[in-house]
């Protein structure tokens, strides 16, 4: 998960840009961590396929990391 610099001093524009990228960042990170193709990601997302404990832990870690990134991004504006 890459960390981007603040693109502007515009809170709304910056957080919007970050959130628009969230689904792609989540998918790409889960695929990388789990060793899946994009097709496997969507097949598992739409089906009732079971996840291994390792996959479950990686999916949760990716989600937590992305949420932390957005929280950290918004906190940069709180100190201004």
Pin down the residues of each PLM region.
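A broad helix-preferring feature
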Residues: 24, 34-36
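Recognition helix of helix-turn-helix/homeodomain-like DNA-binding domains
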Residues: 36-51
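The alpha-helix within a helix-turn-helix
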Residues: 30-31
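Basic side chains
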Residues: 27, 43-44, 56
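DNA major-groove recognition helix of helix-turn-helix/homeodomain DNA-binding modules
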Residues: 54-73
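Short acidic DE-rich linear segments
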Residues: 74-80
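A short, Lys/Arg-rich alpha-helix, primarily the initiator
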Residues: 1-23, 27
């Amino acid at each position: 998960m890459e960390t981007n610099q603040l693109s502007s001093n515009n809170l709304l524009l910056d957080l919007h840009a970050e959130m628009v990228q969230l689904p792609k960042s989540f998918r790409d990170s889960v695929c990388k961590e789990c060793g899946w193709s994009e097709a496997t990601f969507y097949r598992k997302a739409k089906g009732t396929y079971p996840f291994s404990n390792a996959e479950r832990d990686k999916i949760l870690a990716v989600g937590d990391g992305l949420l932390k990134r957005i929280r950290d991004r918004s906190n940069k504006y709180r100190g201004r």
